[in-house]
Structure formats: structure tokens, C-alpha cells
Amino acid sequence: GGTRSEVVLASRNGELFVVRRSQREPAALAWELELLDGLADAGFVVPRPVPASDGQLSVEGTWVAAFRPGRHPTAPDEWARVVRLLAELHRFSIGYPQRPGFASSADLLERSAGGDVNLDRMPRAGVAAVRSAWAAVQTGAVSVVHADPGPSNILVGEDGSVALIDWDESRVDVGWFDLAAVPRDVPLPADTPLSRDAIVTAGVAWEAATSWVAEPDYARRRLSQLRSRQA
């Protein structure tokens, strides 16, 4: 589920569905659902929105997708498939428009807010730390990023297919943020121009900033971790 939306499992005529109540603004939610619909059309395994009877993809912030069984990745070869899938996502979505109300890490080097980030609420030293980490990864193409591809948001099917679920935090940014949570024993793409440490540090910085208002205790732990990585 996550901390920024409500998720329940529902059944209709013996078929299981996931019902999500989003807290996003209508334009931001519409962007997410249109993205998912387009990715599903392109062959990505994602939660495709089930339209309501009038054809709308959401009704007052609530939307529905078919339930997909699966387990979270554990083995290195499963994570290697995840890495390939993320790289494919990034290539596919180069040039995609930014999510309404959101900002990329590059934007936030100058701006103070976008999406779940509000740097005005953070201490000045914390803002300097996260911006330093983000500045270090500003290379390569800008594309859609899932933005939270940890194991709980990845499902491996019985057929070996890999599904990315819970796109609530997705935005447009440099793709390296999606690689920050890849286990250390799993290689990153061979053409990655950045060090793994720089990518992980940028990811820690993003988690600190994006959680500062909604999950302050967690955010402070991540900021402490960031400072240790930068020391």
C-alpha cells in the first residue's frame, strides 16, 4: 500500500481487484493512470486501470486494477531482470512530460518544492546535503522513473515475468534514482556512467526529502545516513 494512499483487495464475481484511493491532485493522478495505461499497451507488466462504467479511469480519486499474484524478488537473477526492465522503462519514456505538480531532482537544485518534496520545511544544512547528492547524478537521459522500486513494489510471476506495482511516487527524472535500491550483489547496467555510491547517495537524499513532511522520523534517519555517506 504505502503511506500516501489507501489500498484494499476486492472481489467481484470471483475475480480479485486492487482498489486504490489516491491522495494525489486530480491532474497528478490522471498522469499516473494514463502512464500505466500506455505502459500496459506497450507490453510492460503494470497495474492497468479498469475503467468505470462511464469510461473514467478514476472516480473521486479511487481507481481499480486487476489483482496480480506474485512474489517479491530475492535471487540475483530475478533482480537482474528487474534492472533490465527498469532500463527498458527509461529508454521507452525519454521525453515524457513531467507529472503535474512534481519536480525533478534537477528542478529542485533551484526550486524548493514539487511532488512530496518541500525543501522549505527542511533545515538549511539538510537542503544543502540533498542538493549536493542530486547534483552528482545529473547526467544521462531524463525519463519516467518509478521512484520506489523496492522489493515490496515488484512482483515476480510464476512465468518469470516482472511486474512493477504502486506507481504513486512516479515522476520524470534521471533514471539513476530507480537503481538506488538494487542489491549490492546485482550488477548495474554496463553503460552506467556513475558510481554506485553516487546513485545510492542520491536515492537516500531523495527519501529524506520526500519523507520529511509525511514521515519525519524516517526522514531524519535517512538524513543522518546521508550525512554519514557524505562525510
PLM regions: where:
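ATP-binding glycine-rich phosphate-binding loop
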Residues: 1-12
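A conserved alpha-helical element in kinase catalytic cores
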Residues: 20-61, 72-89
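A glycine-centered beta->alpha junction motif in the catalytic cores
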Residues: 61-76, 110-117, 205-220
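A cross-family kinase active-site recognition segment
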Residues: 73-124, 142
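Protein kinase catalytic-loop region centered on the HRD/HxD motif
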Residues: 136-143
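Active-site Asp-x-Gly
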Residues: 143-144, 156-198
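Catalytic-loop of the protein kinase fold
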Residues: 144-146, 151
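Helix-rich C-terminal or lid/interface subdomains of diverse kinases
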Residues: 184, 188-231
